[in-house]
Curated annotation (Swiss-Prot):
Species this protein is from: Drosophila mojavensis (Fruit fly)
EC number of the protein: 1.1.1.1
Stated consequence of mutating Q147P: In strain: VRF
Protein keywords: NAD, Oxidoreductase
Subunit architecture: Homodimer.
Chain's gene name: Adh2
Gene3D superfamilies: NAD(P)-binding Rossmann-like Domain
UniProt name for this protein: Alcohol dehydrogenase 2
Length: 254
């Protein structure tokens, strides 16, 4: 997918990886970049607008834990304004295994609900034009960081959901792929809680190993967007982009 002249919605486009990815997107000249985030950051929005004045950058406050109905209402406002949306990026995420319910709500349920809401506008069975979804999951969806099993499981769930969305594309007209960053130097990983405090030093121990910068992650994120491969499972780790082959151990045969 060429980003130029496209209309893009980016959930959590002002976060660590999100903001650098927003920068890379704006450089490529989309028609509209609509950022949905929990906390407004006028300075960040101003920076994006200045980076490429030809791009219309707008912000709407959005908490992914709201209901599908509330999300649908917000999306209707956006679709009424833009008429079409080409790409939805779901980037919301938290890392804190003390907050079990919120971790699942933000990392998994919020993604499911946001996508469920946008299907009202995209699903070809309802006369929609289809669309593309990029879900930010995690390498922990492949193999857990076992000291944060709630976070890891929430990302595995998001990855599984994305894989199913891709298989449903012939029915819905909506394609999907996952972006799975490795350990990236953001505020998310500088300090976080393990489940039941099984490893109080989990953040410190994790950062003893090689990491990537948010810019490295963002640059490869955009390459994955441009590749636009339905069902792709992209590993974005240590400054590299790699398509992962998923091993099938069972098939429903339906």
């Amino acid at each position: 997918m060429a980003i130029a002249n496209k209309n893009i919605i980016f959930v959590a486009g002002l976060g660590g990886i999100g903001f650098d990815t927003s920068r890379e997107i704006v450089k490529r000249g989309p028609k509209n970049l609509v950022i949905l985030d929990r906390i407004e950051n006028p300075a960040a929005i101003a920076e994006l607008k200045a980076l490429n004045p030809k791009v219309t950058v707008t912000f709407y406050p959005y908490d992914v834990t709201v209901s599908v109905a509330e999300t649908t209402k917000l999306l209707k406002t956006i679709f009424d304004k833009l008429k079409t949306v080409d790409l939805l990026i779901n980037g919301a995420g938290i890392l804190d295994d003390h907050q079990i319910e919120r971790t699942i709500a933000v990392n998994f349920t919020g993604t499911v609900n946001t996508i469920t809401a946008i299907m009202s506008f995209w699903d070809k069975r309802k006369g929609g034009p289809g669309g593309v979804i990029a879900n930010v999951c995690s390498v922990t969806g492949f193999n857990a960081i076992y000291q944060v099993p709630v976070y890891s499981a929430s990302k595995a769930a998001a990855l599984s959901f994305t894989n199913s969305l891709a298989r449903l594309a012939p029915i819905t007209g909506v394609t999907a792929y996952s972006i799975n960053p490795g350990i990236t130097k953001t505020t998310l990983v500088h300090k976080f809680n393990s489940w039941l405090d099984v490893e109080p030093r989990v953040a410190e121990l994790l950062l003893e190993h090689p990491t990537q910068t948010t810019l490295q992650c963002a640059q490869n994120f955009v390459k994955a967007i441009e590749a636009n491969q339905n069902g792709a499972i992209w590993k974005v780790d240590l400054g590299t982009l790699e398509a992962i082959e998923w091993t099938k151990h069972w098939d429903s045969h339906i």
